């Protein structure tokens, strides 16, 4: 059977990335508390294409991805190595996004409910292997300015803290979620009874945070974590009294700690 993809291309233009995207794939996430959580991931993967080749064999991505069952750094490097070999490429890239549910206990009534967190993994290999993981955690922020100038209350809203890290040692998704929640005005909860709602509202009022505050505090926490070699923090609040959102971002290398 004729191999069209393997035909020589006369244009002689190399392509940096060729691949598949938005592939839905079942996989398991290892839990910090032992066990696994099943989820459905959205996958994009690619390789570079030599200037003399017309195309790649897309089906080979799926064949290689068949070994992806549980998320670990080791399996990602294996997949990239296999893609480079089978596609006769120099570079391979893999990106995965998936929902992950943490079980939260409400602060007063102690009732449990799941909270969805968006997780992602990005891996690339050329000469060296690069591996990033991250979370996008929903939190609660209350405006310090609104509290300061108002006689009654303060505007508050849901916000998202996106943390992306490179590490020298394994780090749990749950650890990143905890860092995001502890540096906001308050965590979010799916289930709150009236005593819980009172507690969360008052806690946020006593702990006002701009997006700038959250970004800086999260960055300082990551800066001091010996496991982390690089990070990026992006905070966005769904402003409740404005017809726009507010955001702040910072990454390692943007500043130097003094003292």
From Swiss-Prot:
It catalyses: GTP + H2O = 7,8-dihydroneopterin 3'-triphosphate + formate + H(+). InterPro entries: GTP_cyclohydrolase_FolE2, GTP_cyclohydrolase_FolE2/MptA. It comes from the Bacteria. Coiled coil: none annotated. GO terms for biological process: tetrahydrofolate biosynthetic process. Keywords: Hydrolase. Pfam families: GCHY-1. GO terms for molecular function: GTP cyclohydrolase I activity. Pathway: Cofactor biosynthesis; 7,8-dihydroneopterin triphosphate biosynthesis; 7,8-dihydroneopterin triphosphate from GTP: step 1/1. The record marks 143 as: May be catalytically important. It is an enzyme of class 3 (hydrolase). Its EC number is 3.5.4.16. Converts GTP to 7,8-dihydroneopterin triphosphate. Belongs to the GTP cyclohydrolase IV family. PANTHER family: GTP CYCLOHYDROLASE MPTA (PTHR36445:SF1). This is GTP cyclohydrolase FolE2. The gene is folE2.
